[in-house]
């Protein structure tokens, strides 16, 4: 009789020990994937408007320069404005480069080219969206970020402000060490130094 009870009890211990949650090797590691996402500015579905604007300029690296853009556009039936200014300091790169960027008014982002270009001195970006409908977000959940190795990472900047009620997104002094996508995203985790 003892042996008849021992076999089912032993089987229960063996099966319980083989469950996924139990491991004699320690806890299983889980992969943390970024949940940050580029924001989406709300547009009326009936509106068919241009949502990207381009600015470009040939810049001599020994002299530096600026690439600027100011565009008025319709957002959710109202007039809105985007301004962007990329400042390239003297000596940021050698030779002459054709610097270009595309501002996307649907995602409050800016894509720079030539892609994957790095600099010996940081470039400086000021970008402002005024009059945009970002009512689906809380200001405390937004951060100005950039794309690094397919992950959205908080950018370094001097000043940033997201005012949902006024439809205002402002970034001053964003530091750009390489060309990638920069823009407003939802916050995922702590802000990096």
Region roles according to the model:
Residues 91-132:
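Mature extracytoplasmic domains of secretory-pathway proteins
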